[in-house]
């Protein structure tokens, strides 16, 4: 594996093919300086000696002790207590608040006199009414009695006596399908709508119906994003057509407005001509449910000249109504994926497995994460992936630098097979002087990192020296050997070691937003993006803006929709929409897709206008409900409507997932072991499938190593005191520290010391029941040293395995859940091996996206990518075969439903 830090100044550094080193005095710097200085070497063939305190490039940082700390971190316990109390308070507020109905436009009281008019003009219909039969056929709901099954959040339809095709207001003639401004409440911008009806009500009042257009600030994006956005700006002339309608009295019409439809794929010159001749334009629709911005179906947009575009009919797939380029048509069935903030690869693994079931060969070509152990895990399980261990912002800078290098060194007609064969910078047989060194080849590229200054660096292999002597050198020091740079860039371009704009079909990732965590006492509620801990959301979107993938899938915690009125969630949507991506936001619960944990997460789809926007897969399993969603986004929970009665599989419980795993002790040093028994449940049979059976092509259709072995079945080793405590926790459902001697439960379910029982002590002299357990959540908590049970689920798999303030003890063993048991709760296949210290493995598993959720989303992506996803509904039903063990669901197709309310490169 490549080094995580540059070589020290004490080690000789070579910077070109035949370049003289600087004087000895120039190298007399501290050993922590980046390796941009040169030292004099006595003889070219002499191997340099390392100082004793010097870290070799290939050495890894020392393994952290894989044991639980002697005492829990006091500040961490306090922060956990604050976060839990805040979460409970927020959930209570949610329960107390009324659930919002469908957003409806309202208008102010109509004004009889208009400024600038010649006098009072009573609004009036023009011409004869529609024939009665035609009116009833066009608008049947206006002539029917109100249905008894009307939903509580639906407005009652105003009944009509007759309908008209035109009306006159303030002397201006308005016709059906005209676009108009409609009077809004005081201090609000006038509403924008398209007239769909003129009718006289049974109350003899004159009405019109509008189908509303939304400005960006009227949508979930909100005016806050419009005012504070420092990135892509929203075009103020751009509006979004919705399906929402309202009835209003005729006098609320203010004036006409010219709105044209712009095909998202229209050529720029044609678009400019149309925009010059309009007041506003629209290219997408907006739906409140799932905060959806989407292409407008041809039958649902504008008509006549309004829909005209300058796209050749030869480019349109008439059966689908979508633009298909030659490159897209040839690439159907295969797609490339970039996994940002990849962790150990749970999200990309699930996406690829699901896409394969839909018939799409989705391959994770690139992955980026700052955790070196997570990168090692991902690389092992996806050996063909170019895995980069670096910060995302440095990765973006590298992409831009790589693009420039490709422009400089790669020609379209290049013959890669003979690249560099005919060029020689100099005669390698010429004898070296004592301070000269030869660049044998360039082996890697990075941008900054590890204390280095910003800029491009190459990993240099020196002629006559082993790989342990490789160094990272700035590009400025290698300008004397352009052939080596050219060879590296041309080969890297051919192998696509880094993506260029247009190379990536799908970007997925979960940018960390630690600034909104309850474990952060200094959260910026007014301007969350000013907090450095939330800046990765910006970086993620910047990478999307640069690479322009066909699809984007961002995952994050539900707090991005709760904290600061959902600022970060709104920001992510705003960026995608401003970049002209279709977008859709939903919240999915891991337990709904066959896991024994709740774990609600936000998933945001983005799709170029040329592509089909993916839907959300509806649940396949019942789930034990825990917590809820923010009210403002309650229409974004992926679930069946309460009026629907689907047939779902039973909720998965802890025993379904882990009851087949062998018993292990508090300390289990073996990373590989035998199962010892056969699977007992459908889930266990599925999770034990091989790579080949799961359609995992990471090993090119082979099963890979360790086939049939049980991996990572290791618990975090409890310290002696905690192990003694755990051994005394009863083996029963609901057991925890409250069952230990000396504790009793008093009023209001608050624990207290039992005055009749002397305090019990451990062999170390410390108390059996620690004070922190008694005081946690003011004595109300059931979590310290809590034992899970077979018929329960967990709220969410976490990154820590300490039992001090969470329920994580095995049902009938004196230990915490193992890494593999946690991995099963996240849906990782048993063949998926983790690397690093045990504590790091827990972190990797806990931070991952639940694999079954990603798999279901991957299936949706596969259908959309191949244009096999039909209808405008945001939801679809997975085929029955999707959840059946050993069944390949590729031939099956889902059905839509209606809307409910390379090398690990380290730096």
From Swiss-Prot:
Keywords assigned: DNA-binding, Methyltransferase, Nucleus, S-adenosyl-L-methionine, Transferase
Positions with biased composition (Acidic residues): 64-89
Superkingdom classification of source: Eukaryota
Ranges for domain BAH: 172-297
Intracellular or extracellular location(s): Nucleus
Chain intervals with Low complexity compositional bias: 1-15
GO molecular function: chromatin binding; DNA (cytosine-5-)-methyltransferase activity; DNA (cytosine-5-)-methyltransferase activity, acting on CpNpG substrates; DNA binding
Stretches assigned to the SAM-dependent MTase C5-type domain: 335-868
Consequences of knocking out this gene: Reduced overall plant height, early flowering and reduced fertility.
Pfam families linked to this entry: BAH, Chromo, DNA_methylase
PROSITE patterns recorded: BAH, C5_MTASE_1, CHROMO_2, SAM_MT_C5
Record's GO cellular component terms: nucleus
Composition bias, Basic and acidic residues: 30-63, 115-124, 131-140
Disulfide bonds: none
CDD domains reported in the protein's UniProt record: BAH_plantDCM_I, CD_CMT3_like
The EC number(s) this enzyme carries: 2.1.1.37
Parts forming coiled coils: none
GO terms of biological process kind: methylation; negative regulation of gene expression via chromosomal CpG island methylation; transposable element silencing by siRNA-mediated DNA methylation
Domain Chromo: 437-500
Region spans: Disordered: 1-154, 303-323
InterPro entries the record matches: BAH_dom, BAH_sf, C5-Methyltransferase, C5_DNA_meth_AS, C5_MeTfrase, Chromo-like_dom_sf, Chromo/chromo_shadow_dom, Chromo_domain
Catalytic reaction(s) noted: a 2'-deoxycytidine in DNA + S-adenosyl-L-methionine = a 5-methyl-2'-deoxycytidine in DNA + S-adenosyl-L-homocysteine + H(+)
Protein family according to the UniProt entry: Belongs to the class I-like SAM-binding methyltransferase superfamily. C5-methyltransferase family.
Function noted in UniProt: Involved in CpXpG DNA methylation. Plays a critical role in the maintenance of CpXpG DNA methylation and suppression of a wide spectrum of transposable element (TE) activities. Required for proper plant development in reproductive stage.
Protein name: DNA (cytosine-5)-methyltransferase CMT3
Source organism: Oryza sativa subsp. japonica (Rice)
